[in-house]
Curated annotation (Swiss-Prot):
Keyword Signal part of the UniProt annotation: yes
Family annotation (Pfam families): YfdX (PF10938)
NCBIfam families assigned to the protein according to its UniProt record, in alphabetical order: PRK10316.1 (NF007645)
Superkingdom, taxonomy of origin: Bacteria
Record keywords, A-Z: Signal
Signal peptide: 1-21
Protein name as it appears in the record: Protein YfdX
Organism, as annotated: Escherichia coli O157:H7
């Protein structure tokens, strides 16, 4: 009789466990989906911020070129566009600032506007590493940066990442100065202000992993 009762209890426990798992499977799947969506949303926001900073800096460079070619109106248009890109209040700049980097202006922050990945200078070619680099390039072409980095890491290939950082407040100030000078038709001085914005960019190199 005891065996029958125990068997019945075990069956009941197993049955309830199955029901619990079935009931919670959609919840777990939903949570995982939400996490993936949040990660994608964060990555998209960071990418948008980088693009805004990069486009603003391109506008600065082309504005200087326009001044060189005697087209101040085009330079003014591009400078205003760059300023608008960096003054977008809907953008959460601080959330995606590069931490731990000292800036020249108080309360400033560096924003990553571009990045490049390369092999470390100590790299020594071997057939295995060359094969890993080929596979990594294929994965990068498909947008799988994480997979590409893992391929290189497993093959013992040292990788460096160069991040191009823009001091947000300093660049905004330089653009504001350039706008005022362009309005006053002080084009030489405006060019220097734009150059100051361009010169504020720094390159931060970091070893992702070493061989």
């Amino acid at each position: 009789m005891k065996r029958l009762i125990m068997a019945t209890m075990v069956t009941a426990i197993l049955a309830s466990s199955t029901v619990w798992a079935a009931d919670n499977a959609p919840v777990a799947a939903q949570q995982q989906t939400q996490q993936v969506q949040q990660t994608q949303k964060t990555a998209a926001a960071a990418e948008r911020i980088s693009e805004q900073g990069l486009y603003a800096m391109r506008d600065v460079q082309v504005a200087r070129l326009a001044l060189f070619h005697g087209d101040p109106e085009k330079a003014k248009e591009l400078t205003n566009e760059a300023s608008a890109l960096l003054s977008d209040d809907s953008t959460e700049w601080a959330k995606f600032a590069k931490p731990g980097k000292k800036t020249n202006v108080n309360d400033d922050q560096y924003i990553v506007i571009n990045a490049s990945v390369g092999i470390s200078e100590s790299y020594v070619a071997t057939p295995e590493k060359e094969a890993a680099i080929k596979i990594a390039n294929e994965k990068m072409a498909k947008g799988d940066k994480k997979g590409a980095m893992e391929e290189l890491r497993l093959a013992g290939v040292g990788v460096m990442e160069n991040q191009y950082l823009m001091p947000l407040k300093q660049t905004r100030n330089a653009l504001a100065d350039a706008q005022k000078l362009l309005d006053k038709k002080q084009y030489y001085e405006a060019n220097l202000a734009l150059k100051g914005a361009e010169d504020g960019i720094i390159v931060d190199s970091e070893a992702l992993f070493v061989n």
